[in-house]
């Protein structure tokens, strides 16, 4: 069986990392070798200090993540032995990377208010100030997502859209299993029942 990539996309703070980890664990329970790959592992070191908000937003969108390297790594991996292994790629703006043909896309949706609340909680735990976090949200994360959604329309292209406003009760908004092989569909069902 061929190797597969499944992409878990969504706003910053939508619960992608948590959902992707649950999906990888469920795939393993279905007998697959599953690994997580985070778009955050492909960040470029960029100094945002002193930039005007519009310049900061543009730099974040255009240069912060090395999407070409993501695409190269996935292509090389997907061309490996037909062992049925799965990579669960999670992160923001994933359609900017060149994903292997047939990659199912799962998009997690949350309100801007809930995303902001989660980002604040996450980043305060990392020692950032509320002011610094609000600046990142307003100058990088949300403007980049607006631009990404206008350019790539992930909601229209998604195989699965999940309302993840409540982590404990994710709700399927739309689902097409056409590109979800049975083990992936079963793993997704397991995650949706368990969350």
Residue spans of the language-model regions?
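Conserved lysine of the Walker
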Residues: 16
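Conserved nucleotide-sensing/catalytic segment adjacent to the nucleotide-binding pocket
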Residues: 35-38, 43-89
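Post-Walker A helix-loop "phosphate-sensing" segment adjacent to the P-loop in P-loop NTPases
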Residues: 25-35
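Extreme N-terminal, non-catalytic leader segments
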Residues: 1-6
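NTP-dependent small-molecule kinase module
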Residues: 120-125, 146-195
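ATP-dependent NMP and nucleoside kinases share a basic, alpha-helical "lid"
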Residues: 87-125
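Hydrophobic positions on the alpha1 helix immediately C-terminal to the Walker A/P-loop
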Residues: 19
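P-loop (Walker A) phosphate-binding loop of NTP-binding proteins
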Residues: 11
């Amino acid at each position: 069986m061929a190797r597969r990539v499944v992409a878990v996309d969504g706003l910053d703070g939508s619960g992608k990392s948590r959902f992707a980890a649950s999906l990888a664990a469920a795939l393993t329970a279905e007998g697959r070798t599953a690994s997580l790959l985070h778009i955050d592992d492909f960040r470029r070191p960029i100094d945002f200090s002193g930039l005007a908000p519009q310049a900061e937003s543009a730099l974040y969108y255009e240069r912060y993540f090395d999407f070409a390297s993501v695409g190269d790594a996935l292509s090389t991996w997907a061309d490996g032995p037909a062992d049925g292994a799965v990579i669960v790629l999670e992160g923001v703006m994933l359609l900017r990377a060149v994903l292997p043909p047939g990659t199912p896309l799962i998009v997690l949706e949350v309100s801007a208010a809930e995303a902001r609340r989660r980002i604040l909680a996450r980043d305060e735990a990392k020692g950032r100030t509320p002011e610094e976090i609000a600046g990142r949200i307003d100058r990088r994360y949300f403007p980049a997502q607006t631009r990404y959604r206008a350019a790539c329309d992930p909601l229209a292209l998604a195989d699965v859209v999940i309302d993840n406003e409540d982590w404990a009760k994710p709700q399927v908004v739309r689902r097409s299993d056409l590109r979800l092989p049975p083990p992936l569909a079963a793993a997704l069902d397991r995650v949706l029942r368990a969350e």
